[in-house]
């Protein structure tokens, strides 16, 4: 009954991934991001990740893979998802949702840390505000975006952009693959 729809969804996902892979800059950006994050962790820094909705879940997944494990046993790495419900509700109520991530970076971020922002549109104002706060504190910025990069295009030290202009779920599917590759490369960098 739905077999053709299922196949169509898988083929569309396959094409979005093929288009992403075909751009060598995407591969280079993933490598640069992993190297940047690994250098911060090696020097005692931390990675703070953030996103909204499904991207928030991806930010939590990234931090969990750092503090827990990916494929192999190894020491835990300093990864924090900006996801504490009391922080999010307090800052949203007292300052506005635009500041939920930046306020956290202002409180616990240090020069040499890294912020990972995830936004399928590249237009999430709270992540843009966090980028501004991060840069003011000497925190390096990596962003995962989609479409044309939105307002975040050009703001980060490293942008990994999925140039897909359809539904956001296709972008999220590639973001999670990128996250897993980042973790794998970070582990390799820190194993030497």
From Swiss-Prot:
UniProt binding sites for Zn(2+): 61, 65, 172, 180
Which InterPro entries did the record assign? GmhA/DiaA, Phosphoheptose_Isoase, SIS_dom, SIS_dom_sf, SIS_GmhA/DiaA_subfam
Where in the numbering of this chain does the SIS domain appear? 37-192
Pathway connected to this protein: Carbohydrate biosynthesis; D-glycero-D-manno-heptose 7-phosphate biosynthesis; D-glycero-alpha-D-manno-heptose 7-phosphate and D-glycero-beta-D-manno-heptose 7-phosphate from sedoheptulose 7-phosphate: step 1/1
The reaction(s) annotated as catalysed by this protein in its Swiss-Prot or TrEMBL entry are: 2 D-sedoheptulose 7-phosphate = D-glycero-alpha-D-manno-heptose 7-phosphate + D-glycero-beta-D-manno-heptose 7-phosphate
- Additional note from the record: The reaction produces a racemic mixture of D-glycero-alpha-D-manno-heptose 7-phosphate and D-glycero-beta-D-manno-heptose 7-phosphate.
Q: Which family does it belong to?
A: Belongs to the SIS family. GmhA subfamily.
Q: What is this protein called?
A: Phosphoheptose isomerase
